[in-house]
A protein has these predicted regions:
Chain A
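Double-stranded RNA-binding/processing signature
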Residues: 1-310
Length: 310, 224, 198
């Protein structure tokens, strides 16, 4: 670490003129040099990649082959870089194919497919009345690059990935996580891979409202459609409460009814907002995804029959 | 607007209450109103949070104080300089500002912290039942009074007095004329009333009001 | 300057929390675990690698040396998910550097610590999430405060209140007033009447 405190300020005045000038010059030079360049973690002295991989397999309790894990953590850019280096060193094109490892693109594709299938299955099981469109939206959110990259960096893949830049890009992180799932599938079977998805990707839904993840543009229209499909009458909205009408903090509570049967109610600052929110509330109650609904039992998915063998 | 925002709005919305102060004791109703203004009637109440509701109090001109309080209780005013404190008896204060008594009663029921002024700003007081339309529109609930509104004798119809059960019969010896009060009482002319010395702005106490309060206008007359 | 002095003088030498002054506004958040650790069927130890910097000669690292000689192998066997690096450095103070899955780093000076204290610090790092720099807004937090529906001012309020025009005469008086003497007499009188007729 470089000390960027101005000498001669907090420790009192510097008495020697020459020392002051010397320190000031060092300070200026440090500023001119700019920030330190980012370095690979592997550039530091305390780094043993094999040990790291070994620890990684034990961290998640998976019995993985170290070589397969090494492949899963190798990004395409790393391979490209090695090939480029070899070409520059003057090696023949035939030698380039004899590399001992491959990149993780295939594994990632495989892992992503497993994750997508499992998430759809689990969500369908736990929210049977939620429409297919919504489940697809949630799956898309869970498998989006930002989510998966966040999970991947949280699982410590940031330093394990072999790529051409010190801090890997979100796509690299995403590929690494999916490839890890893929390699679990290859080593110990699909069920184990699905448990991994349930433990680390599906749990991303904790504390999130799945009705907010699926953004419905016109909730009243959707409610009408759903009621029609169920053979019920069209929804009617009624004002239940209104207070502070002429004040800034006005509150309206609007309820939605179908054939005098209560569907849902909600509050809002204006009547139109309250009506829209009431329609959303009615949808939540119809789909059985409101707050009364229990969370997905992430640790008991075996008992629910979603995962057959442990 | 997200759905949890709507829930938040519903939980923390300020409800407007109406309070009819006619024939109510301002001290007891002040306790109730202060509780509502501070939000203590809500389960979400927490001392640091502003969770109070709004209250419109009407008919404050017609509040009923206990016992002799209109005359015997006063607003003590202490100003900065020496010998400048004086009292305003409540009936005089009520003449000056008919909403002031209820206002002060509510104020005295609140703890004297810095939030008190903001809570009091949510109290709207009106001397009669004339309330601006834009305020009465907001109301969605009413606070019940703490006193039974009494029925005055001149409110009763002659039919009521007739049908009321006769509890007992007057004895024959009793002369009903003797019940007439005016026979035993003489109205004292003002020149006969003993004058008191009034000290201006000296001491708090009902003897030292800043104007003269004549109290004894009647005198008992002995009939032999 | 005074703050700086206070930091030096009053705080113990070994403290994992950094100095916090209430005059400054520091970042704060609700209590949480990284990636909802432990919600699924497994717990992931957040400590990724542990570097022990130690001197072979100086007295300051006697406890650290003891720990390495006696407990290191056992520790590594029990916790295979932590990569332990031992870094001998000549004539310098012993340090403990923990690196976490999320990329956080913890540095703890181990000067003059005995074996037990070193063990304590290592297990302290092992059981951590890794970011003590955050101030916690509250010690507890929940994302779903209620499953019965959150309370609003309108719950349990009689529904007829919205249909009335205010001021309303029915709501002015007390709900359950005491019976006055007049009313009592009238009631007694009516009872007497009934008794006489029956």
């Amino acid at each position: 670490m470089v000390r960027l405190l101005r000498y001669g300020t907090i420790f009192g005045p510097l008495k020697d003129r020459w020392r002051y000038l010397y320190k000031r010059d060092l300070y200026k030079r440090r500023l001119e040099a700019g920030p330190e360049p980012e370095r690979f973690r592997s550039a530091l002295i305390n780094w043993n990649y094999d040990a790291e991989l070994y620890a990684c397999t034990h961290r998640f309790g998976e019995k993985l082959n170290i070589e397969s894990l090494r492949n899963a953590m190798t990004d395409a850019s790393f391979l490209k870089q090695i090939v480029k280096q070899r070409t520059e060193a003057g090696l023949a094109a035939t030698d380039q194919t004899t590399l001992a490892f491959t990149h993780n693109q295939e594994l990632a594709k495989q892992g992503k497919q497993i994750a997508e299938d499992f998430l759809q299955k689990a969500l369908h099981y736990w929210y049977p009345k939620f429409p297919q469109e919504g489940i697809e939206a949630i799956t898309k959110f869970l498998l989006s690059e930002s989510t998966i990259a966040d999970i991947s960096s949280g699982l410590g893949f940031k330093t394990l990935i072999r790529c051409d830049i010190p801090s890997p890009r979100p796509t690299m992180l995403t590929n690494a996580l999916f490839a890890f799932i893929g390699s679990i599938n290859e080593n110990t079977g699909r069920s184990r891979a699905e448990v991994f998805v349930a433990d680390f990707i599906l749990t991303h839904l904790v504390g999130k409202d799945i009705n907010e993840i699926w953004q419905v543009k016109n909730p009243m229209g959707l409610l009408t459609k759903v009621l029609e499909e169920n053979g019920r009458q069209a929804p009617e909205s009624r004002l239940i409460w209104a207070t502070g009408v002429s004040s800034v903090l006005s509150t309206y509570v609007v309820g939605v009814y179908s054939n005098k049967e209560f569907l849902g109610k909600s509050a809002g600052a204006t009547v139109s907002i309250a009506e829209e929110m009431a329609a959303r509330d009615a949808l939540r109650r119809l789909f059985e995804t409101d707050e009364k609904r229990a969370q997905i039992p992430f640790d008991k998915l075996y008992k629910k029959g979603l995962l057959l063998d442990k | 607007m997200a759905f949890n925002k709507a829930q938040q709005l519903a939980t923390f919305s300020r409800v407007w209450y109406l309070f009819d102060a006619k024939w109510q004791c301002p001290h007891m109703s002040g306790e109730r109103i202060a509780r509502i203004l501070r939000g203590e009637h809500k389960p979400i109440y927490y001392p640091g949070e502003s969770t109070g509701d709004c209250v419109i109090a009407i008919n404050t001109r017609h509040v009923a104080l206990r016992n002799d309080a209109w005359r015997s209780e006063a607003l003590h005013i202490k100003r900065e300089y020496a010998k400048t404190r004086y009292d305003i008896p409540l009936f005089k204060l009520h003449e000056l500002d008919p909403t002031k008594v209820l206002h002060l009663c509510v104020l005295s029921c609140m703890p004297s912290d810095s939030i008190r002024r903001y809570d009091m700003a949510r109290l709207y007081t009106f001397p009669d039942d004339a309330v601006p339309v834009h305020l009465i529109k907001n109301v969605c609930d009413q606070i019940r009074g703490s006193r039974v509104i009494p029925k005055r004798l001149d409110d009763l119809t002659p039919n009521d007095t007739k049908t009321f059960p006769q509890m007992f019969k007057w004895p024959k010896e009793l002369v009903l004329d003797d019940l007439d009060r005016d026979k035993f009482v003489r109205v004292v002319p003002p020149e006969e009333i003993p004058k008191r010395e009034v000290m201006l702005g000296q001491r708090a106490g009902k003897q030292n009001y800043w104007f003269h309060v004549p109290t004894s206008r009647h005198e008992e007359v002995k009939i032999n | 300057m005074s703050q700086f002095l206070r930091r030096i003088t009053s705080l113990p030498i070994q403290s994992i929390r950094s100095f916090h002054s209430f005059d400054e506004v520091t970042p704060a958040k609700y209590i949480s675990t990284r990636l909802k650790n432990g919600v699924g069927s497994r717990y992931v130890c957040q400590l990724q690698r542990l570097t022990i910097q130690v001197c072979k000669e100086f007295r300051t690292s006697f406890g650290t040396r003891d720990w390495i000689a006696n407990d290191l192998i056992k520790f590594a066997r029990e916790h295979p998910y932590v990569v332990v690096y031992v870094q001998p450095r000549r004539h310098r103070a012993p340090n403990l550097v923990g690196e976490y899955l999320a990329g956080d780093r913890q540095w703890i000076p181990l000067s003059n610590c005995d074996r037990e204290k070193v063990n304590w610090w290592i297990h302290s790092l092992l059981t951590q999430k890794g970011d003590p720099q955050w101030r916690l807004l509250k010690q507890m937090h929940t994302d779903s405060p209620s499953v019965q529906g959150i309370w609003t001012p309108f719950t349990n309020k009689p529904i007829d209140r919205i249909t009335r025009t205010y001021p309303d005469k029915d709501l002015t008086e007390m709900e359950y007033p005491q019976i006055t003497a007049t009313q009592q007499i009238q009631e007694l009188f009516e009872q007497q009447k009934l008794n006489k007729t029956s």
